[in-house]
Amino acid sequence: MKRIWVSLMIAITACSAHAKRVTCKHFATQAEAQAYMEKYKAYHLDGDHDGEACECLLGGSSHGLARCR
């Protein structure tokens, strides 16, 4: 039983270590990023903590501004 438990813990750790963090580059539009952030509580997508995820993407409040380039 102990061997199974240890094997399971190693497998879980290995899988989570290789998981990539989702960033704004993974989305085509701000709306997609917003939906993802709200569904999965991925608040790291909201860099300035104003409630809007990836605002530099198409459809976001900052799309096209110089600071987004």
From Swiss-Prot:
Signal peptide start-end: 1-19
Cited Pfam families: Excalibur
SMART domains cross-referenced by the UniProt entry: Excalibur
UniProt keyword list: Signal
Stored InterPro entries: Excalibur_Ca-bd_domain
Designated name of the protein: Uncharacterized protein PM0157
Organism: Pasteurella multocida (strain Pm70)
